[in-house]
């Protein structure tokens, strides 16, 4: 049985570089014969924070397909931008709307950090790793941190061979993880 992969673009911000990086990663996996699902947080129902979480779990018919997708996934890749020293609140809210503990328990994940700063979202990746470990997910130790990301997308495409090589390395590690 083949494993199911889902790539999560970790922001709901329009025109975010995160989605471009997610597409690059998807291409890398595809070139290695891996079929993926792509989850773009911008496509979530705008009211899901109020209509799909906690006592409303399972009641939002527009959100439920995302819950099923995440439950049926074996391996995850989260492309995570740094916002205000951590990761986007939309991503945390999305995670809170998923079935606990079954969504992530004993599954595998990889994290990629993006930042305008020179830290490459180190704190964001640390915070998210703690959350996923709490949820029982095994996180790949190699976490590319793509700093000053805008400089590598001036042409609208990833123009950093170093960053591309980092993503390839992680993808190959994830396939064998």
Residue spans for each PLM region:
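N-terminal beta1-alpha1-beta2 submodule of the flavodoxin-like/Rossmannoid cofactor-binding fold
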Residues: 1-96, 100, 157-175
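Acidic pyrophosphate-coordinating catalytic loop
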Residues: 48, 117, 151-154
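Short helix/strand-capping connector loops at secondary-structure junctions
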Residues: 145-157
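Short, conserved loop/helix-junction motifs that constitute active-site signature segments
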Residues: 101-105
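Short glycine-rich loop/turn motifs that provide flexible caps or phosphate-binding loops at active sites
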Residues: 9, 88, 109-112, 119-120, ...
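Fold-independent oxyanion-binding glycine-rich loops
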Residues: 10, 41, 114-115, 149
């Amino acid at each position: 049985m083949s494993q199911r992969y889902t790539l999560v673009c970790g922001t709901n911000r329009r025109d975010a570089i995160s989605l471009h990086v997610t597409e690059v990663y998807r291409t890398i996996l595809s070139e290695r014969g891996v079929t993926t699902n792509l989850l773009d947080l911008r496509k979530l129902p705008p009211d899901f924070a109020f209509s799909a979480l906690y006592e409303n779990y399972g009641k939002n018919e527009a959100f439920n397909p995302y819950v099923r997708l995440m439950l049926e996934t074996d391996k995850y890749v989260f492309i995570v931008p740094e916002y205000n020293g951590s990761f986007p609140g939309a991503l945390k809210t999305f995670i809170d709307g998923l079935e606990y503990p079954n969504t992530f328990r004993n599954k595998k994940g990889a994290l990629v950090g993006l930042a305008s700063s020179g830290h490459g979202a180190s704190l964001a990746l640390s915070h998210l790793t703690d959350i996923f470990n709490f949820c029982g997910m095994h996180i790949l130790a190699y976490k590319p941190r793509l700093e000053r990301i805008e400089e590598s997308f001036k042409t609208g495409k990833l123009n950093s061979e170093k960053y591309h090589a980092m993503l390839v390395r992680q993808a190959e590690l994830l396939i064998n993880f």
